[in-house]
């Protein structure tokens, strides 16, 4: 379920939404890494910035999901998406998977806006990724037949570790993680159908 054995072409064919997300955030990281002044201005316009949201720049609740602070940040989040997102795209379908992913990220950014000071600045897909864990948590609690006992234990262990690290690491947007997790869990009531089959 979480072990990728597909070749490149098969991965793209089976998981088009996941592929698009991975490619888009990589392209955006490369673009915004350019030292040009105009690029820096563009980045400042789409970065998560609570004061900007307060001034009506609502897109800042969406765009930070695709942005990253550095290569390590991008790599870690991309690996998390690569490992944990494909199974959900297959189980939920493209539309519902995208709803969960984007919805959780937006909910995480709304939570950041509500709880953090106005000068708070943030980027990253972590809220959306925690939303995926929220879906898995829903399955562990209510639809265990979809993932099985072994994967359930793995999810609980990984989630406990991730939440713990969110509290320990001061550079992590803890509110995006927690709100994203809750968002993914709640969206599961809408997106995880009774007819769903195990991956």
UniProtKB/Swiss-Prot annotation:
One of its GO terms (biological process) is proteolysis. The keyword Cell membrane applies. The keyword Zinc-finger does not apply. GO terms for cellular component: plasma membrane. Its EC number is 3.4.21.-. Its main location: membrane. It is found in: Cell membrane. Keywords: Cell membrane, Hydrolase, Membrane, Protease, Transmembrane, Transmembrane helix. It is an enzyme of class 3 (hydrolase). GO terms for molecular function: serine-type endopeptidase activity. It is a multi-pass membrane protein. The active site is at residues 126, 177. The chain crosses the membrane at residues 14-34, 65-85, 97-117, 122-142, 147-167, 172-192. Belongs to the peptidase S54 family. This is Putative rhomboid protease YdcA. It comes from Bacillus subtilis (strain 168). The gene is ydcA.
């Amino acid at each position: 379920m979480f072990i990728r054995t597909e070749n490149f072409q098969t991965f793209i064919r089976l998981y088009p939404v996941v592929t698009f997300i991975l490619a888009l955030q990589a392209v955006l990281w490369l673009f915004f890494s350019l030292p040009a002044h105009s690029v820096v201005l563009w980045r400042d316009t789409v970065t998560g910035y609570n004061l900007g949201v307060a001034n009506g720049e609502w897109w800042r609740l969406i765009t930070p999901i695709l942005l990253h602070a550095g290569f390590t940040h991008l790599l870690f989040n991309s690996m998390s998406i690569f490992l944990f997102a494909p199974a959900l795209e297959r189980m939920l379908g493209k539309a519902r998977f995208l709803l969960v992913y984007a919805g959780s990220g937006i909910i995480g950014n709304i939570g950041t806006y509500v709880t953090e000071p106005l000068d708070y600045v943030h980027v990253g897909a972590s809220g959306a990724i925690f939303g995926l864990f929220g879906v898995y948590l829903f399955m562990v609690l209510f639809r265990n037949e979809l993932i099985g006992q072994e994967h359930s234990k793995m999810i609980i262990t990984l989630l406990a570790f991730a939440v713990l690290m969110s509290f320990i690491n001061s550079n992590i947007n803890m509110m995006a993680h927690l709100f994203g997790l809750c968002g993914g869990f709640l969206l599961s009531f809408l997106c995880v159908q009774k007819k769903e089959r195990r991956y």
